[in-house]
């Protein structure tokens, strides 16, 4: 994918991987429309890039609000005539404890991590289908590969997202629309800064953004990283559950030391 002058719409753009992706995409010469709830932060990012001559657009919205997401997409299309790459990055995690189990925690996570992406795809798809061109990408997580302690909500939302994108790829590619699923491991962001447990293969956010942009440029259908850690987890997906369970419990004990 040629990212120079590419019309990119990215959600979750105010911090973490999203903000780093804005920087990386601008360096590629892309035109970047940024969506997040914090309009003031988006304006600060936009001012910095506009000062260097980049073309950036601020379209604040809460991705859990379907009407707001559609409104943001219409604003980008009105400004630039369309979206070439829709990059859905917004998401959040919460570790759930069975001693305080609440199904609403699942609903809140899914509203952002799954439906927030589906609202965005729903919003941009008609124009992409008309043009028979475009690309959809979303940031899932290696946590979506298999179950892990306290990740019932976050992990299942990312598993749902991976499955949805892998399925949509079959449906959209005949219409000229590409689909990429992005599955990062641990990345140093404001979200992971709150974690107190062991995070193997923790990656710098700018390096993560560079890996994602390189993968998009090369037209990858899946972008997973860090390489050694992600390939290890891919192999673990193939293990019988009793063996997988023993390995996970051992890793948890190691991280608790």
Regions found by a protein language model. Give the residues of each.
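Conserved glycine-rich Rossmann-like NAD(P)H-binding loop of the short-chain dehydrogenase/reductase
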Residues: 30-45
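Conserved glycine-rich cofactor-binding loop
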Residues: 14-15
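Active-site helix of classical SDR
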Residues: 121, 157
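The beta1-alpha1 cofactor-binding region of Rossmann-like NAD(H)/NADP(H)-dependent oxidoreductases
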Residues: 60-71, 103
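C-terminal helical subdomain
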Residues: 181, 197-232
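Substrate-binding pocket helix/loop in short-chain dehydrogenase/reductase
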Residues: 97-98, 102-107
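Residue(s) in the substrate-gating loop at a strand-loop-helix junction
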Residues: 141
């Amino acid at each position: 994918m040629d990212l120079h002058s590419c019309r990119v719409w990215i959600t979750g753009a105010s911090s973490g991987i999203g903000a780093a992706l804005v920087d990386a995409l601008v360096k590629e010469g892309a035109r970047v429309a940024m969506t997040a709830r914090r309009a003031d932060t988006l304006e600060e990012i936009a001012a910095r890039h506009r000062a260097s001559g980049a073309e950036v657009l601020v379209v604040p919205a809460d991705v859990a609000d379907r009407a707001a997401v559609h409104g943001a997409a219409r604003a980008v299309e009105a400004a630039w005539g369309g979206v070439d790459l829709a990059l859905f990055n917004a998401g959040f995690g919460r570790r759930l404890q069975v001693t305080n189990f609440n199904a609403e925690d699942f609903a809140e996570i899914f509203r952002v991590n799954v439906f927030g992406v589906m609202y965005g795809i729903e919003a941009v798809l008609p124009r992409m289908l008309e043009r028979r061109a475009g690309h959809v990408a979303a940031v899932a997580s290696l946590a979506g590969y298999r179950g892990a302690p306290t990740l019932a909500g976050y992990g299942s939302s990312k598993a749902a997202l991976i499955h949805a994108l892998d399925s949509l790829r079959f449906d959209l590619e005949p219409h000229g629309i590409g689909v990429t699923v992005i599955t990062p491991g641990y990345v140093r962001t404001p979200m992971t800064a709150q974690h107190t447990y062991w995070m193997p293969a923790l990656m710098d956010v700018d390096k993560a953004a560079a890996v994602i942009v390189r993968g998009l440029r090369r037209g990858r259908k899946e972008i997973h990283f860090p390489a050694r850690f992600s390939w290890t987890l891919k192999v673990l997906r193939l293990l019988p559950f009793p063996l997988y369970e023993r390995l996970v419990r051992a890793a948890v004990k190691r991280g608790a030391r």
